[in-house]
């Protein structure tokens, strides 16, 4: 990360700052790109879309493949549960907030919705942090050599999780291990769990699991 920090330069810092300040808008724009790609796939078909994807990939555009996920907006599809009882805070990773499943998937439910459904089956009420579309653990900025910006986004997320968990009263789930790794390194006020870890520790005595 130190080498990347040195290479980032003033331009990198400005770009990182813009992304941090406008993260909600960036997520919205990326969802739009995914919608356009999905529409193109539906209209043109896999073969022609793959050819176009390979051609524009030569110009530096990320390569399109048939497994590219559809656009998804977690903040509009999952919401807080009301009432008392067992509660858990769920923060879907940025990827799972924006991306659903691909066109050929047999199960069309995005991961975030599957997680919420599982928690409901176990009797948990799910709390979603406020302003989720603007929040990020900071890993994106850390990976680009922008530690100060990364720490800023981590602090923003911790504050939102602190509020959502009622000052640490309820556990917090994040569904991406790399994100959770950074969160556990930087956050001290909330109880953090990866999805499988939470299921093993808290749900295994509340649900019946059937191997398929």
Task: Describe each PLM feature range.
Residues 2-212:
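Iron-sulfur cluster-binding electron-transfer modules in prokaryotic oxidoreductases
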């Amino acid at each position: 990360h130190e080498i990347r920090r040195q290479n980032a330069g003033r331009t990198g810092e400005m770009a990182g700052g813009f992304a941090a300040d406008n993260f909600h808008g960036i997520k919205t724009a990326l969802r739009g790109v995914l919608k356009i790609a999905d529409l193109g796939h539906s209209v043109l078909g896999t073969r022609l879309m793959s050819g176009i994807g390979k051609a524009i990939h030569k110009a530096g555009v990320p390569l399109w493949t048939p497994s590219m996920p559809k656009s998804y907006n977690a903040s509009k599809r999952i919401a807080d549960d009301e009432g008392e009882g067992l509660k858990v805070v769920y923060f879907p990773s940025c990827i799972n907030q924006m991306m659903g499943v691909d066109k050929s998937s047999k199960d069309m439910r995005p991961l975030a919705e599957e997680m919420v459904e599982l928690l409901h089956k176990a009797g948990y009420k799910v709390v979603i942090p406020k302003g989720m579309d603007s929040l990020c653990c900071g890993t994106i900025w850390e990976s680009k050599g922008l530690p100060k910006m990364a720490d800023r986004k981590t602090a923003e997320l911790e504050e939102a999780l602190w509020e959502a968990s009622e000052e640490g009263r309820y556990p917090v789930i994040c569904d991406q291990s790399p994100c959770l790794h950074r969160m556990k390194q930087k956050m001290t006020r909330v109880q953090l769990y990866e999805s499988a870890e939470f299921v093993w520790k808290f749900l295994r005595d509340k649900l019946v699991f059937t191997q398929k």
